[in-house]
Curated annotation (Swiss-Prot):
Membrane topology annotation: Single-pass type I membrane protein
Superkingdom of the source species: Eukaryota
Keyword Electron transport part of the UniProt annotation: no
Residue ranges of the propeptide: 20-866
Protein name: Lactase/phlorizin hydrolase
Species annotation: Oryctolagus cuniculus
Region (Glycosyl hydrolase-1 2): 360-853
Segments on the Extracellular side according to the record's topology features: 20-1882
Disordered: annotated segments: 1218-1237
List of catalytic residues: 1063, 1271, 1536, 1747
Family: Belongs to the glycosyl hydrolase 1 family.
Keywords annotated in UniProt: Cell membrane, Glycoprotein, Glycosidase, Hydrolase, Membrane, Multifunctional enzyme, Signal, Transmembrane, Transmembrane helix, Zymogen
Subunit structure, as described in the record: Homodimer.
Amino acid sequence: MELFWSIVFTVLLSFSCRGSDWESDSNFISAAGPLTTDLLLSLQYPQGNQTSDFAAGGKDLYVCSQPLPAFLPEYFSSLRASEITHYKVFLSWAQLLPAGHSGDPDGNAVRCYRQLLEALRAAQLQPMVVLHHQHLPASSALRSAVFADLFAEYATFAFHAFGDLVGVWLTFSDLEAAIRELPQPESRASRLQLLTEAHRKAYEIYHQKYAAQGGKVSVVLQAEEISELLLESSTSALAKDSIDFLSLDLSYECQSEMSLPEKLSKLQTIEPKVKVFIFTLRLQDCPSSRKSPASLLFSFIEAINKDQVLTLGFDVNAFLNCSSTSKKSISCFLTDSLALQTDHERAARNSAPVSTYQRVWEMFAHQPRAERDAFLQDTFPQGFLWGVSTGAFNVEGGWAEGGRGPSVWDQFGHLKAAQGQATPEVASDSYYKWASDVALLRGLRAQVYKFSISWSRIFPMGRGSSPSPQGVAYYNKLIDSLLDSHIEPMATLFHWDLPQALQDEGGWQNESVVDAFVDYAAFCFSAFGNRVKLWVTFHEPWVMSYAGYGTGQHAPGISDPGIASFQVAHLVLKAHARTWHHYNSHHRPQQQGRVGIVLNSDWAEPLSPERPEDLAASERFLHFMLGWFAHPIFVDGDYPATMKAQIQQRNEQCPSPVAQLPEFTDTEKQLLKGSADFLGLSHYTSRLISKAPEDSCIPSYDTIGGFSQHTDPAWPQTSSPWIRVVPWGIRRLLQFVSLEYTKGKVPIYLAGNGMPIGESENLLSDSLRVDYFNQYINEVLKAIKEDSVDVRSYIARSLMDGFEGPAGYSQRFGLYHVNFNESSKPRTPRKSAFLLTSIIEKNGFLTKAVKQPLPPNSAHLPSKTRASALPSEVPSKAKVVWEKFSNQTKFERDLFYHGTFRDDFLWGVSSSAYQIEGAWDADGKGPSIWDNFTHTPGNGVTDNSTGDIACDSYNQLDADLNVLRALKVKAYRFSLSWSRIFPTGTNSSINSHGVDYYNRLIDGLLASDIFPMVTLFHWDLPQALQDIGGWENPSLIDLFDSYADYCFQTFGDRVKFWITFNEPTYYSWWSYGSGTFPPNVNDPGWAPYRISHALIKAHARVYHTYDEKYRQSQNGVISLSLVAQWAEPKSPDVLRDVEAADRKMQFTLGWYAHPIFKTGDYPDAMKWKVGNRSELQHLATSRLPSFTEEEKSYIRGTADVFCLNTYSSKIVQHKTPALNPPSYEDDQELAEEEDTSWPTTAMNRAASFGMRRLLNWIKEEYGDIPIYITENGVGLTNPRLEDIDRIFYYKTYINEALKAYRLDGVNLRGYFAWSLMDNFEWLQGYTIKFGLYHVDFENVNRPRTARISASYYTELITNNGMPLPSEDEFVYGQFPEGFVWSTSTAAFQIEGAWRADGKGLGIWDTFTHTRLKIENDDIADVACDSYHKISEDVVALQNLAVTHYRFSISWSRILPDGTTNYINEAGLNYYVRLIDALLAANIKPQVTMYHFDLPQALQDVGGWENETIVQRFKEYADVLFQRLGDKVKFWITLNEPFVVAYHGYGTGLYAPGIYFRPGTAPYIVGHNLIKAHAEAWHLYNDVYRASQGGVISITISSDWAEPRDPSNQEDVEAAKRYVQFMGGWFAHPIFKNGDYNEVMKTQIRERSLAAGLNESRLPEFTESEKRRINGTYDFFGFNHYTTVLAYNFNYPSIMSTVDADRGVASIVDRSWPGSGSYWLKMTPFGFRRILNWIKEEYNNPPIYVTENGVSHRGDSYLNDTTRIYYLRSYINEALKAVQQDKVDLRGYTVWTLMDNFEWYTGFSDKFGLHFVNYSDPSLPRIPRESAKFYASIVRCNGFPDPAEGPHPCLLQPEDTDPTMSPVSQEEVQFLGLSLGSTEAETALYVLFSLMLLGVCGLAFLSYALCKSSKQRKKLSQQELSPVSSF
């Protein structure tokens, strides 16, 4: 046969070569190809010895995907051996240039086609490349007007990318198909003209720019269309002008009467003569008896070559056959007969076509088990996406947060339909833990995260034009965080959780839901599509249709398999199609995303393969499960024929229809067909399928489908009854999907695969799941590599455990275990998480990890520096630090500073080898001194623990890398175990296993983009070296140098930051001085100095080794980590204490730093003290060794950077200790203590201010050297995950470091938290926890779980510090015109005259005269004596320029016994005179009727617990309205009823001091207070309002509450309860509905019943009372001072108090500035938030802030900067609430006008804008600076913008001197100077003016800079401003 074809080609060549000038192709062209999916399938999975059909027409073209099928080279070689010269390759424009233009090519596609072309060239086949066959890019840019230009751009791209491999180019292979693809409004002729122009441009570009490549260009034409094309000049270019040869698509019917010469006659009309190539040859009806291939070809040649038309070659596919008997043998040949290729015989052969399912099943049916289960060691294609998934209702929780509406799954949970009556209300709490979830993803190294959007979180009712802002914000934060972590978001629009509101309308059985879904999707595309590029419309719609509406097992629980199930699917498909088309039309052009659908399917194997009916049932099963949705979308727009036929048959067999399958209209079919950019596939398990045993007419999924489902008992079982482990099923399913649906045109995204474990199983060691993932993922790899299936992703289910529908929380799918019993819902990685990470890192299954290239020096390390040889001083020059900082006020010291660190700041965490590694004797490691010590009984370790296992980091490397990535750290500081590398301590015993561990750790860090910082020695000396004397043996210096040299040589190519010793100060003292650490040498006077001497020399030796041998090639830095506590002098003004503090610094930090960073020698302070004390001890020489001059020179400058470990501070004073016995500690001659006000920790008190001072001291002492804080952290004894104290520690300490950097110019380069995780903390064992991650030491796997501090630290890293949040930025502006400015007081607190003029006793009179009730036994008998000082008070008010004055009336001064039996006219007259004086001063009165001071006579009959008081209060109010109402237009009934009820009758802190009925009395009192208010309001409203025209309301008080942990839903709920119990207790009945809020009613009722009561302790209002109470307000009076951090606290049920009912405990943030009151922290942000809460909760009522202020304690504090800060900040937040949030705020009142009697604290807490000098009998009111500041705000009505120039309101009038007795001039500390108050006042004015000028200048400069560049970089180190933080 080969001889036959050789003769034929020889003859053909003689025809073709006559006159040929195509020298490069002088041989006859015989062309095969292109590749099709069917061809690849037949070659790969031969069935018997059958030959493959190579006709290309009608086949699905192969879309290039990597890797190329492995058998292609053999196939190509076989073609070349069969005389084939060329092979057709069809490029995909849409694949190469998805956007249509060359600006963003698909690199993977380019590489793939190049590999294909190179494979052809390697087989000596010439590629014949077609630029476009079908499928234009999906881009709006492909408009008619620019099509030709875009095609030319594409052609240019192809010529450039592939031209070196291609000699023959064809622009179009099917003009008709291309015409149909162009925009339809154009006529066919104009579209053909467009194609002609596109071809012409491509032709010209090739010959102008790429002619040197020597190729030819043409276009494929239908032979019958030649004449038509030649007639039109506009298209003739296609046939003769713009082609190098004519390429024809030729069909020939052998039986046709028309001869070839007639058919090709038009070829002769083309001038000049062109060469002809038959690109496609189709033979029809050519029986073998008629013609041989040779005769047929000769007749073609004769017809074409007539009149010198030259034939170049033919398409020989018609004559080509290949056979393949096994995968290893492919044979292609040209047949000598046409019989094999005749249509007639082909039709006969295929009379019973084999279905896709049957073909796929037959591919694998006879596969031996060993071959089936063989593990493939290979990698996935480049660009393959790895990820994990979740669903909204599975993990989010927050079911009612942010206005979210309920979904069908919420309803399902509330009906207690899930196992264990579980609900998804909290689930995994991802709504609040999105940042933690993204951290988990980083830990996994996930590249894509598939999550779903909760429809009802966006649109609570399913519809509407107003989406929930909170819901949108949640997804924005999640998406932005994913992208910031380089994780691709894949957003699912619908994951089974239909809004319940839509379900109430019929759900997916109501056609209108389609419109609602499209609207919802359209919003999501608009809101998130600029960042989300992968969209899933529906996730597993089969599950919802089958289980939600078929079996009823899922929400919404409808059981109607015959009708509802099919209705739902029908509407889902229509919703999907419309959504896809909406995206395609409206969003794709701009967003360039992809929209698909995720379908789930099991694989189906016939139960009895020998039974055809089982085979048919298996295929039917797939069509019912997968084809139900896939066939309409990916095939023809309609349901599978098999499915339709089966349902029809079943309905015909039954007396009534069993199922109703809706029909699509033709329009709907067109809409559905092709409506997906990818097919997402979920797969979990496989089934054995048989034909249903009998035809049942009872509708069910199986009976309708006619099949029965089974499993093989041999298949491993999981905890889920429906999932068996059948890995090979996924490969078969992927092959089926590829051939049946995607056909190489649409990529497959594997979007769901996983298995659960049960609650009773090992929740962390999920070995079965590890095997599951390993095997299933490997089968996916086989599908890609061996079956050429185009799979683009693997997405595991699930990221973490969640709510699993009917199974509740019993089925755990998570790679991360979630502890649902903990309120914080902590996540802990399972073994399967580490497996998946390993696969991701290797991109598959490699036996060895890929060697990573060396990373760039990402840490931006400083260059080598040299120390200065400055002489020492005693005390050192660093004493300026104490001078600068020690006299700061607490407010100045602790005020929080906002800013960021340098851009290359190195954020990291630390650990050390012995503390975490474990494996103490594994793999040849030698023992260390700590191994020996901990194994010795009585060693002093607290819990008798050892580091034998510790965190097991030696065996848990994957776990450590996981948490490091999750933290987002840039660097990891760890130490090497000397005895793990050199077991005996010397280089004669190198342990390769230990070296390998550190290599893997370092490589893993670098692969995770984490910079390694390596410590050579962290206290764990090899025991073998200790046995020869340890560091007291001089040879240790050489041995340490040898060890370091080996480390530099082995790891230095990747490690660029080395630390020789960690904390040598502590090591030398604890190990050789106190003897508490090994080697336990107790020699306090001598050994520490000797050891330190050796360590310093050892360090210097190693430094020089690195400097001389490695620095030039490795380019790293080297130093040592020194430790120090800040020393604060007890009396900063006492020189001896300052010297003692400096001495402590020199004896600890300077001991090592001074020789290394300064002079090469010890500090003079040390030499002096130790030398003198040695002499006094009668020693011949100093106990402190000395260095030779040579050693000093060698030591000096042996560190490139300064590494500092610091944890705490000490207060130091001079002390003269005993001389003997000698001791390093006594040599320092000082005493240490800690301030008891500093927060406690497990080891030392926290004193964050010391951080800034210590950094400044280093700068002053050692110069501007780069500093790295290599350890800082806090130990806690409580192992809980909610380590809020650790957050406070880091927050305050790092803020002080930030101040040092930004304000003081300290050259700070990095910060490392101690520690990454809990570990062995030396003598404390495992009792103290320093870790950001909790380690469970009781669990053999030592799982690591993130604490909330880990999330906080990640946030710091993300923000690179503590930038000022945009919402906290100061705003300029003015309040609305008419805004009320006021100040307030209360009668009892200021009036005095407690028994004057007939005043009756009040409860506070009684209370203050009772011992132990008031601080300092203060009484208010005189107070401020305002009863006698009306004029002084009015002057004070005028100082403030206020428009209003809020004061209260003393009930017992008007009605001495509380009743109207007697009205005290003298008392009433006081208020008349006061009001008249106010009005005369143009100040309007705001009168509070009741401010805590109940007449004692009423208290004697029960007070507010007696319901008669309601009437008494109404009568009292009536007197006030009658007598004062003509002058008072602003009334407040009650002030802070919460305080009256809670503190007066609950805690007993306030009068009347009742505390023994805390669970009932406060509620009774509150009940009566509300009714009394309502009665007073109605009285005024009904009787007086018309004539007096005033307003009346109540003043409510409330703190704002923030959740302690904002990521914990329990804490969020607790914060809400806190506010509802405080502010809502009284506001809700009055401002909302006349009744208590539901939170209170529910809480109190449930706790009352739990305590055994029959009813709630909270009284109930009758319906008439509710109506009377509701709406009894004209405004919302509001008092606010501070904010708390709230968290859930479960009190015992027997405890009946308001606090217990509330179920909340509260703390405060340590960084919040304090005040004179323990309960009041300055939190201005909370003011704005609670004003917004009032707006939202009570429909934006008019609000008057009736109290707001801050206290101090101590002296007069005239220059009260603290109060100015408070007022400025709080009032500015109020301005934001008005301007930005549209809160209806009408007025602001500062508390208080003047210092007064502050209830149970007496006169200790001072809130006044005026100082009242109680030591002066005249009680003068002296204005503080805050009074003047407040007056300026009042006059300016806010904060005028300085950028607009000086405002007239800032021009202050002359001060009015108040009437007062002479006061002595007091001294004021101002900016470190002692000034008189007058001078300080003048200085403050000057400073204030300068500040205003500075602010104006700064504003102008900021505007100019912002205008010039929006992207201005942060200040460099040289640009930092040393301004104060205040």
